[in-house]
């Protein structure tokens, strides 16, 4: 919500109006987690290690690029990975559902489809994470399960936890939902194995992730062009991600001229009507996550910008070694 990251009078008023509800949310969350830790509520232990990639706050913090980066890193170490996701926005006829790389994103969800296309590993979506893991292990020889999101899904026991923090917005006003963006308070960070800062260091760790664009890809032809090839052309841009401004800022950092921009809600289900606002004579840029949903009605001058995560820091290398060693020992 807009007021989570603002400091004007109306934002403060909304915070205090919603604060009693935040107290209730926080209390229920604390009690619920305590019941899981005491085994009063049942949880599932996977026969292979589980790594959770999550966050403390609502909205796009960069979990999916981290998941893709992790999969590729473990693949380079000879570790077979399976990915599970709740599949937010998916409308599969049944669950658990194994994502196919040519799926319609309305069936699989945009992020699971993107992970499957970028990595080639098996991806299974289901609100029931246990069923997703069991299906993956029944059909694939996985050494490691990575859960894209699910830090607060305590029905699933985990061996490792990664939290991704938005380096620009961090934790907003610092309140838990609905007065603020937090699902859990920052003291939860003391319990996780690795903290990754997206874009800027925050003081919570020295591990930094940069999302590096290399080129633009045409949605119709597949042609690739360097971003600098568009520097003298007025462009339009859309983004249906958790923090659209990050995408627009990235394009401007490459000296691209954005004439019109349009932000959509995260996981927006696009159709051609959403783009009637833009001139068909100008290039339209979008994220790769948005592109998987726009291909059926894409025009000849629509482009998406894939990014590669570059994660730096001694902590991440130590983390990778610890996880790899545990997997080898379990084998």
Curated annotation (Swiss-Prot):
Transfers the gamma-phosphate of ATP to the 4'-position of a tetraacyldisaccharide 1-phosphate intermediate (termed DS-1-P) to form tetraacyldisaccharide 1,4'-bis-phosphate (lipid IVA). InterPro entries: LpxK, P-loop_NTPase. It catalyses: a lipid A disaccharide + ATP = a lipid IVA + ADP + H(+). GO terms for biological process: lipid A biosynthetic process; lipopolysaccharide core region biosynthetic process. It comes from Histophilus somni (strain 2336). Its EC number is 2.7.1.130. The keyword Transferase applies. Belongs to the LpxK family. Keywords: ATP-binding, Kinase, Lipid A biosynthesis, Lipid biosynthesis, Lipid metabolism, Nucleotide-binding, Transferase. This is Tetraacyldisaccharide 4'-kinase. It comes from the Bacteria. One of its GO terms (cellular component) is plasma membrane. GO terms for molecular function: ATP binding; tetraacyldisaccharide 4'-kinase activity. ATP binds at residues 57-64. Pathway: Glycolipid biosynthesis; lipid IV(A) biosynthesis; lipid IV(A) from (3R)-3-hydroxytetradecanoyl-[acyl-carrier-protein] and UDP-N-acetyl-alpha-D-glucosamine: step 6/6.
